[in-house]
């Protein structure tokens, strides 16, 4: 059934699904069903927080990811036209505003600038723009980056809560906070701020638009259903696959801080 979901470059399959899959793996490793042995000490409180140890490698990784993402979003149009250029521009702006926001937040909190903050902010901005790159204008993209950085940075605190400790849920890569929750926010925000006019820049695409610019309130509900369905599909499917793999002799593991 075609509900008319707006997802320009794959926010659900790229971000929500990957975050759900990583979360399912972390929970399964703490509570294995079959051959793997349960760890009695695996909690977020006893694990060492992994920090980048090589700034040069992190910088090169950020340049590689950021540059590739520009081609990824712009290339989604499968053509070289004004819409592809617009997609590239909003992607770059959203990543930049996200990086700046995260750095400023960190500076206000700890009093120093951080390349790690720039990296995480850029990633959160790129995640925010993925489903909406072909549907929003430059000013909206700028605020998307700010929103994504603030939201994802606060979401990082979840793994240090009592809830995470009780579930022995560990997320060193911050996949749940950035990709999963950030992807959900991006998908929902696309339904709110998508614009018919921007989508038609290629002269072909027609969409009903979003809530605020085109008055299409129904689109918000569609986007929420899409985000929830994508998460549940990947989480349940991945958890089932992990359990089946755990049944195979030789594949069992002991969950630890690795």
Language-model-detected regions and their locations in the chain:
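Glycine- and aromatic-enriched membrane alpha-helices
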Residues: 1-258
